Regions:
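Sec-dependent bacterial lipoprotein signal peptides
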Residues: 2-18
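Feature marking well-ordered beta-strand scaffolds used for ligand recognition
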Residues: 1-3, 20-256
Length: 256
């Protein structure tokens, strides 16, 4: 394996480790803490909620009981259809991004999640994060994503069994995203990183656009933004109240 790919693997591994959360409520897992603030990557294909590990492949949702970490116990496999990509836990539910839409599953029975609803959209790549009554979904077209739209969809999930489109914003080439209170971060691939003020969902305000970095996914946590890109692992400090973001450091990927 070429060294550049090993470097990318190591940085992705660091990113996954930083996603882990050990909050005491047992239902927080990788992508939310006790306050409901997202701290996990939006493009993850696995997550932990309490004593259960949930993974997705291209077609299925798989559940494992990991209360005995030496002997994980497979519990269930649920057919989700096709083009399954990402998984994000929030308030005892799983939000699963697919190329055809967003599936929502309930975790009342953690051994076998139950379907609640599906929000359908045009074919595209589809990571998702959730905060309060809204899901934030980026749609990206081209290449493996097949579609042509590049946009942010804000989905109203106040009626969890009837998710509806609230508003759409055009983007350049959106990949992963992260949300923390009034801050929304969107990675635009080779077109950089964006930070938005989302205090008014009807009128998002662009706070900053870092055009000089490659960004694939983000984790906002405790006013530190962790960004993974093809060129390295970046950190920024941010303040949602002051609408500020500042560069801290980079661990570069050395191309050999």
């Amino acid at each position: 394996i070429e060294n550049k790919y090993l470097n990318q693997f190591y940085i992705l591994l660091i990113f996954s480790i930083l996603s882990c959360d050990t909050s005491s409520d047992g239902l927080s897992g990788f992508s939310e803490n006790s306050s409901g603030t997202g701290i996990g990557g939006s493009m993850a294909r696995f997550t932990i909620v309490g004593d259960h590990l949930y993974t997705v492949d291209a077609y299925n949702l798989n559940t494992f009981d990991i209360s005995d970490q030496k002997q994980p116990d497979f519990k269930s496999e649920i057919d989700l259809g096709w083009g399954i990509e990402t998984i994000f836990p929030y308030e005892n539910r799983l939000f699963i991004g697919a190329q055809s839409g967003m599936h929502i599953y309930d975790l009342k029975n953690q051994d076998k999640p139950s379907w609640i609803s599906t929000y359908e959209h045009m074919t595209s790549c589809d990571p998702v994060v959730v905060q309060d009554n809204y899901a934030f979904v980026t749609l990206r077209g081209g290449n493996e994503c097949m579609g042509f739209n590049n946009q942010l969809d804000i989905i109203d999930i106040s009626k969890i069994d009837q998710p509806t489109l609230f508003k759409t914003y055009e983007m350049i080439q959106p990949h992963g995203l992260g949300v923390d209170n009034n801050c929304l971060f969107i990675t635009e691939g080779e077109f950089g990183l964006k930070m938005f003020d989302i205090s008014n969902l009807n009128n998002l305000k662009l706070i900053e656009h870092f055009k000089d970095i490659s960004s694939i996914d983000v984790i906002p946590f405790m006013n530190v933004l962790m960004v993974i890109g093809e060129d390295g692992f970046h950190q920024y400090s941010y303040d949602c109240e002051e609408a500020k973001i500042e560069y801290i450091s980079t661990i570069p990927i050395v191309k050999l």
